[in-house]
Amino acid sequence: MTNEHSAPLTYRDAGVDIDAGDALVDRIKPLAARTMRPGVLAGIGGFGALFEVPKKYREPVLVSGTDGVGTKLRLAFDWNRHDTVGIDLVAMSVNDILVQGAEPLFFLDYFACGKLSVDTAAAVVGGIARGCELAGCALIGGETAEMPGMYPDGEYDLAGFAVGAVEKTAIIDGKSIQPGDVVLGLASSGAHSNGYSLVRKILERAGARPDQDFHGQPLVDVVMAPTRIYVKQVLAALAEHGTAIKGLAHITGGGLLDNVPRILQQGLSAKLYRDGWQMPQLFQWLQQQGAVADTEMYRVFNCGIGMVLVVAADQADAISATLRAQGEAVSRLGEIVPQQDGMAQTFVV
């Protein structure tokens, strides 16, 4: 006769379902297969993934980036919207390495949860695969960690890792930026993946519901719109205009005010004009509902601009035309000026 202290235990008894993990892998494989590109020698299923750097690079420099989705995940849990946060995950890393001129080559993800829901995880990974397709990189591997007791049921965390390559002579570092250069902005799709702690606080104050109407769309669709991936459009502009594109800034945490200075040398400032772009309705509503000051908006949110380019003044119109031909909404935000005493490196007038 056995009792509860002598009965054989299994991993499932401890909260880890190996069969569910295997079922997820089976769901993931065809999703990853859609992202395959030249260079992949071995992908999902092995102990390590293999990728051959394309031979078109004479002096390739590898560029890597890692990021998560932040507290936007809290809304994904609360509003049961899991199919787009994977796109966010890819976008945050590939847009980051793009600013140095890198072509994203491959991507890996880390999915951690307390109890694995195959359907939820497959929805997330489906978004990751879609993001990789948009970025032209291969989903080459990843890790799913089921850790009982570490996360509440229905919740998970994500991390992503992107690796790209750029020709050594084509690295974009902002060192050639000078007074008179023009600042261009590419439209965002919404709040992207930053500022969501404040977004959630404002939603709570406003008593907002995911299904309420917001200018003809459910609020959930507007708030959870996935981060735009700028890779193919910007790479096309770089291929055509080369060194005339002097600097790129991905507008993430810190908004316009903290991210544009990251590509500027000492002694330079970016002067942006508030009438240079239209702030989307979402940000107008967030500012009104939260009584958020203008400066706070610019240092928390992208305010409608997801990527900034600093370009040679005599090429600004041509570069804008190339980007518009790629489907981008381009705004002329301002220009680079000498930094005066007490002047911020980025300011809006």
UniProtKB/Swiss-Prot annotation:
Annotated GO CC locations: cytosol
Enzyme class, UniProt record, top EC level: ligase
InterPro entries listed in its UniProt record: PurM-like_C_dom, PurM-like_C_sf, PurM-like_N, PurM-like_N_sf, PurM_cligase
Subcellular location per the Swiss-Prot or TrEMBL entry: Cytoplasm
Recorded catalytic activity of this chain's protein: 2-formamido-N(1)-(5-O-phospho-beta-D-ribosyl)acetamidine + ATP = 5-amino-1-(5-phospho-beta-D-ribosyl)imidazole + ADP + phosphate + H(+)
A GO biological-process term: adenine biosynthetic process
Main location: cytoplasm
Keywords: ATP-binding, Cytoplasm, Ligase, Nucleotide-binding, Purine biosynthesis
Superkingdom of this protein's organism: Bacteria
CDD domains the record matches: PurM (cd02196)
Keyword Phosphoprotein assigned: no
EC number, UniProt record: 6.3.3.1
Gene Ontology molecular-function annotations: ATP binding; phosphoribosylamine-glycine ligase activity; phosphoribosylformylglycinamidine cyclo-ligase activity
Pathway linked to the protein: Purine metabolism; IMP biosynthesis via de novo pathway; 5-amino-1-(5-phospho-D-ribosyl)imidazole from N(2)-formyl-N(1)-(5-phospho-D-ribosyl)glycinamide: step 2/2
Pfam families xref list: AIRS, AIRS_C
Protein family: Belongs to the AIR synthase family.
The protein, known as: Phosphoribosylformylglycinamidine cyclo-ligase
Annotated organism of origin: Bordetella avium (strain 197N)
Classification of source organism: Bacteria, Pseudomonadati, Pseudomonadota, Betaproteobacteria, Burkholderiales
